[in-house]
């Protein structure tokens, strides 16, 4: 679990789109995740992926029975190309409003011009969904994490995403910015204060997205529902960044 694979190209392949739980869907590729939230008044998309996987995302939206025009908001967890490079094309197709953490806004202009910037305590509301924003710097200076509720089987589940778990920018000689490691460790402390029932990743390796999705599509148990895996993953992230930095 939590194995980070290194790919020789931007993407390894397509993933059949599927409903994770409630109004939350996976529409990403391997290795970069994208998620749709059906708010009842339009779709919220979390991360757009690579420019050369835009066709996969568009196909996934249609396969799930939605229209591109349903996408109203696009939220980006951070500015790196595997989460933002398809945004300009998707905005041209949808007219969606774009959001990113305020400290990543300038770098994001490499790929698109954000409409709104986000800070801790901000809440994005559309239809039946309210997404709470937490700044979690480290992987990038403006990385954000997201938390919201979804309903399924007569229950309310808290969904959470850590917006930047990767340590490629936290490795000696490759730091994203000064003090990024200290920021990352502090972000983990903040994230541990959140209770999460359904952990979604912004890369498929974060939470075994593909394996769990395949089981769901076969009608088996929903392994995305797990109140323990959030903290297990955060502990893994802490140990990994300490290992690569000799802490």
Each language-model region and where it sits:
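Short, basic/low-complexity N-terminal boundary segments at the transition from targeting/disordered tails
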Residues: 1-16, 97
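Conserved beta-strand hairpin/beta-sheet module of binuclear metal-dependent hydrolase folds
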Residues: 10-64, 145-167
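Active-site HxH/HxHxD metal-binding segment of metal-dependent hydrolases
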Residues: 24, 52-55, 61-125, 224-233
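Metallo-beta-lactamase
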Residues: 43, 50-52, 123, 130-232, ...
